[in-house]
Amino acid sequence: MSARPLSVVIAAALGLSVGVATAAATKEQLQVGQQEYLAKCAPCHGPSGKGDGPQAASLKQKPSDLTTYARRNGGKLPEKQAWALIDGRQLDDRVQQDRAMPVWGHMYKTQARADERADIEPYVRARIAAVLEYLKTLQVK
C-alpha cells in the first residue's frame, strides 16, 4: 500500500483530531509507527525507548525514558501532551529553540511537500498518530 492511501486511512480512523484515539490501533498503523519511531526517535530515545539511543550521549540533556511515560502520569499515557511534544508546532518559539528534540510537525510537513503530496496536514497527523500508537506499546506496567 502506498504512503498516501495509508495516511488517509490512518487520519480518517483517528477522526482527524488531536487526542482522539482509536479503540485499537491497526496492525498497519503500528508498523508505520514503529518504522517512524526507529528512524526518527530511536537515535536519541533508543530502540526500546529507555533514553539510551546512540546519539543520547552527545546531548546536553538525557532523552526521556519513554517506557515510563504512562507510569509517570498516573498510569495513562497523556496523549494530548505527547502529541504536542511530538508535533512541536504549537509550542512557544523559545521552547522550540531550547529543546533538543526536533519539531516533527515541521519535519513531516517538509517531507510531505518534498514528496509533492496534496494531503499535507492529514499526512502530518497520520505520522504523529502512528508514532503515538507505537509509543503506547513501549509502556511498562
Language-model regions, residue ranges each:
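Extracytoplasmic electron-transfer domains, predominantly the class I c-type cytochrome c fold
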Residues: 58-120, 131-135
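The canonical Cys-X-X-Cys-His
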Residues: 33, 37-47, 101, 131, ...
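Sec-exported extracytoplasmic/periplasmic mature domains
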Residues: 38, 42, 87-91, 136-140
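Stable alpha-helical elements in mature extracytoplasmic
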Residues: 29, 37, 78-81, 124-127, ...
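Bacterial N-terminal signal peptides
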Residues: 8-17
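Short, non-ligating residues that shape and space the ligands of small metal-coordination modules
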Residues: 50-51
